Amino acid sequence: FGIDAVHGQSNVVGATIFPHNIGLGAARNPDLVRKIAEVTALEARVTGLDWTFAPTLAVPQDDRWGRTYEGYSEDPAIVASYAAAVVEGIQGKVGAPDFLGPRRVLASAKHFVGDGGTFEGRDQGDAQVSEAELRDIHAPGYVEAMRAGVQTVMASFSSWNGVKHHGNRSLLTGVIRDRWNFDGFIVGDWNAHGQIPGCTNEKCVAALEAGLDMY
């Protein structure tokens, strides 16, 4: 099963806790975050986990967003430079003998996409931006995570121009599956599918039809 071990296996007393992502981003050191991800993966694995919901690849554009600290930077280039390092630290490098080996767990690139760009920084809000801005500001980290072989992607609670990401087929299927050729697993966030019009937490055909594999 999976859990939020984002900056260390913080769910277990005695595990190693590292600075949160905003602090790690200030270090401007991909090699450091790779090593941190390796430790996090190992301590997650020995506590019985197979999957961590990390890395967070948000690109916060408004400091009023209450989850700004979860992003590495407001600069998409910095976020992109960290994405592959964290994914490879968690899972290992594709083709290497230890890829998804006994010291590794599955990574999850989250929260797709634009959660750091919502109007007025509102949590679970609406990113009222153009397709070009969504692509150029908020997506580069995901592209690098895909190149590094990330096995899962988590959809965001937020919306893009009024459409909830959990029900946005043009993004979940059109971009992730068709454009980026991702053949891994797309997972929902905590009952976020229930916010799609016509859905409940218990039932949401629209999310599955949009491309979500599990909610």
Task: Label each PLM-derived region with a short phrase.
Residues 1-215:
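Glycoside hydrolase catalytic-domain context in secreted enzymes
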